[in-house]
């Protein structure tokens, strides 16, 4: 069976003046290789994202964690990227990844 791929993208605060452009590139790449994208942080409102069930925007890492607990199983691959300021490391820690 094919595994479902979920990508969690948090804001990457260290990118400087190209921040929006780089976040857009990250989103576009994730959109090509994953089944679902979970976004956290205010920059995603400046990014051209699909308004579908496969793209969800959350206010913080705790909301994403609660969602992930309800959908993760042995047939799911989880990819997480973001700066420590958006606490993406806590998602991995709490899920024991």
PLM regions: where:
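ATP-dependent carboxylate-amine ligase
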Residues: 1-97
């Amino acid at each position: 069976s094919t595994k479902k791929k979920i990508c969690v993208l948090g804001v990457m605060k260290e990118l400087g003046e190209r921040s929006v452009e780089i976040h857009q590139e990250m989103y576009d790449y994730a959109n090509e290789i994953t089944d679902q994208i979970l976004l956290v942080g205010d920059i995603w409102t400046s990014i051209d994202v699909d308004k579908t069930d496969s793209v969800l925007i959350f206010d913080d890492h705790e909301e994403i964690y609660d969602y992930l607990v309800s959908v993760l199983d042995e047939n799911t691959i989880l990819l997480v990227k973001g700066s420590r300021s958006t606490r993406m490391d806590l998602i991995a820690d709490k899920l024991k990844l």
